[in-house]
């Protein structure tokens, strides 16, 4: 009896050790693939988006050279909108938004996020460094274009970056964020769990230590603490008006993330949940209402 008990204890220890090793290895792999995303280079020109454009660039505080297109409408209203793309994409991912704004007389800044497209920087940091990049782009816009009002709209990771930037950038008149995550830890655990070929309860149990291991690895190897990548916390001290848009059919980033953000946002935060819309597809699901809500949000907050 005692021998059997020792065998079971030994098996349990070996199993736990194997699970810990698996989670550690999975965390390292998760971290490396998340920090070094495949680059999707933009085309040479923003063909068909705007009648006038020029390439621009600025140098971030850490020395990364960041690049963008500045689009100008035929008749400008004096206001500017910055558009921010999602993960593993480039500035061209916001071409549809840029066209909408240009057609309505806004100047549009379309930057590549760091470690994306033609953007400098070795790694993507999910808002930790990108928030300051947004702040510097606002500095650049004010110095170069002197716009009357500055607005911004981001999609997916771009939306999360935009919301995090509000902790350091108070000069946006209003912003629009579609399909953001509330905090990186929760969305990472959710997405890892969805990838694991095991029952849901076991997947979520395994995802937590795997994500924790990845965060620890990122902190030790790259000096980035992903526990701070949290739009829901970043907006707490902001007074910038926020329009949140989220598709109710979004399984990539569930709508509860925008609901959490809305519950913690400033009093002038509005949440639009779009029936039938999947991840960042509100424009396609409800085009007329999308145009109406987004354009009115900007014009209502212009000065």
Task: Label each residue range with its predicted role.
Residues 237-239, 244-246, 250:
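Short beta-strand/loop motif that positions the catalytic acidic residue
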């Amino acid at each position: 009896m005692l021998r059997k008990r020792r065998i079971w204890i030994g098996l349990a220890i070996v199993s736990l050790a194997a699970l810990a090793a698996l989670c550690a290895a999975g965390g390292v792999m998760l971290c490396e693939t998340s920090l070094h995303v495949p680059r999707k280079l933009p085309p040479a020109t923003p063909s068909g988006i705007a009648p006038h454009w020029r390439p621009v660039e600025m140098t971030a505080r850490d020395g990364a050279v960041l690049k963008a297109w500045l689009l100008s409408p035929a008749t400008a209203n004096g206001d500017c909108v910055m558009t921010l793309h999602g993960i593993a994409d480039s500035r061209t991912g916001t071409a549809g938004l840029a066209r909408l704004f240009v057609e309505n007389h806004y100047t549009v800044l379309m930057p590549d996020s760091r470690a994306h497209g033609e953007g400098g920087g070795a790694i993507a940091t999910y808002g930790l460094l990108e928030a300051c990049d947004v702040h510097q782009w606002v500095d650049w816009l004010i110095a170069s274009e002197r716009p009357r009002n500055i607005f911004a709209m981001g999609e997916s990771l771009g939306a999360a970056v935009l919301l995090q930037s509000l902790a350091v950038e108070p000069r946006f008149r209003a912003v629009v964020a579609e399909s953001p995550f509330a905090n990186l830890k929760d969305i990472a655990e959710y997405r890892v769990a969805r990838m694991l070929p095991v029952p849901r309860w076991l997947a979520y149990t395994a995802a937590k230590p795997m994500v924790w291991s990845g965060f620890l690895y990122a902190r030790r190897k790259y000096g980035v603490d992903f526990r701070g990548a949290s739009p829901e916390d970043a907006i707490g001290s902001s007074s910038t008006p926020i329009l949140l848009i989220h598709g109710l059919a979004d399984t990539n980033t569930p709508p509860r993330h925008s609901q959490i953000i809305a519950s913690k946002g400033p009093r002038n935060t509005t949440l639009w949940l779009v029936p039938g819309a999947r991840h960042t597809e509100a424009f396609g699901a409800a085009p007329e209402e999308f145009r109406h809500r987004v354009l009115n949000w900007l014009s209502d907050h212009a000065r």
